């Protein structure tokens, strides 16, 4: 007896179906003959890849508003995995950078959604090493049109989502938080399932929230076994001065997690439902979302995590409400003439700078979560991207 799986859209608009035979040995699969051999080669390429997660904190808006917005969005669109052909630059023998890959994906998706800006905002994850693919949120009609675009090998519904009502992603899923935050922090069996994990300080100086969420996901993967489960289990993170995260796992997994290198302690989340978490251990409870931004006075801010499509005009509009601005400067690459993804914002007063630092850190601009920090010196304008230093924890490759 065969169990049918959802159809896959292959480049050119061809729809094929995939089925798994329940009569065969465990793990064996039978694939419809309509699926070409050239498409099967994609599977092996999915093993080693770098990801570009676009992350947003679930605590930045009132839960009721977020839940309503999430429901409305899901009624119009779903998440799709789009596998692309090798970009022209890579085909010529040279490597493809993150910027080039995002441009390639956005240009393709723009043919369906109408503009590159809209396309970039709909892309929620991208891979550009070993395999070229991205995930985007569009409706079914748009997915069919996308499958016909040049360079598109396949468009498939993202089966990592548990259901249409629980659209988990690489972000800290709002739907996940709403579904588990309606009361107790224990299961029906009486056992705790919500844990606060304190972590060691990372070994690099400059760390962004996106990098830390990726790090925490890899740590949790060692216990849960796969990335998707780890992603949707994390519901809170601390990433500036105190490091750690909160996750929804059973007690046995919590005991195993305590033995993972880099983990300082695993204890019940006694303050579930609040952003005030005790990641400092015995040093007191504090809000991790406000870490490093309280009572800091500075005129000059350093902004990272910018979309390549964010203009100085857009950035100025986002920061102007906090006070009079002296300068808004996005750093551009001298060769490509495109944004490097970071900028400097300077105010006339320290009070305005401090207020912007506290309020804007972790906000979303053009679909990307920005990270705001104190600008150390003006010489950082001339750095060649050292502030974007990637944090790559040591973990066993899958």
Swiss-Prot record:
The keyword Amino-acid biosynthesis does not apply. One of its GO terms (biological process) is mitochondrial mRNA modification. Residues 54-70 have a biased composition (Low complexity). Transmembrane segments: none annotated. InterPro entries: MORF/ORRM1/DAG-like, MORF/ORRM1/DAG-like_MORF, Nucleotide-bd_a/b_plait_sf, RBD_domain_sf, RRM_dom, S8pro/Inhibitor_I9_sf. GO terms for cellular component: chloroplast; mitochondrion. Disruption phenotype: Pale-green leaf phenotype. Residues 1-88 form a transit peptide. Pfam families: MORF_dom (PF21864), RRM_1 (PF00076). Keywords: Chloroplast, mRNA processing, Plastid, RNA-binding, Transit peptide. Residues 299-377 form the RRM domain. One of its GO terms (molecular function) is RNA binding. SUPFAM superfamilies: RNA-binding domain, RBD. It is found in: Plastid, Chloroplast. Coiled coil: none annotated. Residues 54-79 are annotated as: Disordered. Involved in C-to-U editing of chloroplastic RNA. Functions as major chloroplastic editing factor. Controls a majority of the chloroplastic editing sites. This is Organelle RRM domain-containing protein 1, chloroplastic. The lineage of its organism: Eukaryota, Viridiplantae, Streptophyta, Embryophyta, Tracheophyta.
């Amino acid at each position: 007896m065969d169990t049918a799986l959802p159809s896959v859209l292959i480049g050119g608009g061809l729809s094929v179906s995939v089925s798994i035979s329940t009569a065969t040995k465990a793990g064996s699969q039978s694939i419809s003959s309509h699926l070409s051999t050239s498409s099967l080669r994609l599977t092996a390429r999915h093993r080693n890849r770098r990801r570009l997660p676009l992350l947003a904190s679930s605590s930045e808006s009132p839960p009721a508003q977020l839940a309503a917005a999430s429901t409305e969005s899901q009624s119009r669109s779903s998440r799709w995995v789009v596998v692309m052909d090798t970009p022209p630059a890579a085909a010529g023998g040279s490597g493809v950078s993150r910027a080039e890959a995002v441009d390639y994906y956005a240009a393709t998706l723009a043919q369906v959604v109408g503009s590159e800006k809209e396309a970039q905002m709909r892309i929620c994850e991208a891979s550009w090493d070993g395999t070229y693919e991205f995930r985007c949120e569009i409706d079914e009609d748009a997915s069919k049109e996308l499958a016909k675009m040049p360079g598109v090998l396949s468009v498939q519904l993202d089966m990592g989502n548990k259901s249409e009502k629980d659209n988990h992603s690489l972000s800290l899923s709002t739907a996940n938080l709403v579904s588990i935050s309606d009361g107790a922090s224990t299961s029906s069996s009486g056992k705790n399932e919500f844990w606060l994990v304190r972590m060691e300080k990372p070994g690099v100086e400059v760390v962004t929230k996106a990098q830390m969420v990726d790090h925490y996901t890899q740590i949790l993967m060692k216990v849960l076994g796969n990335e998707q489960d780890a992603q949707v289990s994390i519901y809170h993170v601390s990433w500036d001065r105190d490091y750690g995260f909160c996750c929804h796992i059973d007690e046995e997994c919590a005991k195993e997690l305590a033995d993972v290198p880099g983990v300082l302690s695993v204890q019940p989340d006694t303050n579930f439902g609040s952003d005030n978490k005790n990641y400092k251990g015995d040093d007191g409870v504090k809000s991790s979302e406000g870490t490093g931004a309280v009572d800091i006075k500075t005129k000059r801010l350093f902004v990272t995590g910018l979309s390549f499509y964010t203009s100085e005009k857009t950035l100025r509009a986002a920061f102007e409400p906090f006070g009079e601005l002296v300068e808004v400067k996005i750093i551009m690459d001298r060769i490509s003439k495109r944004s490097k993804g970071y900028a400097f914002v300077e105010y006339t007063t320290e009070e305005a700078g401090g207020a912007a630092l506290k309020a804007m850190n972790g906000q979303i601009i053009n679909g990307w979560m920005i990270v705001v920090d104190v600008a150390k010196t003006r010489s950082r304008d001339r750095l060649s991207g050292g502030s974007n230093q990637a944090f790559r924890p040591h973990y066993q490759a899958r």
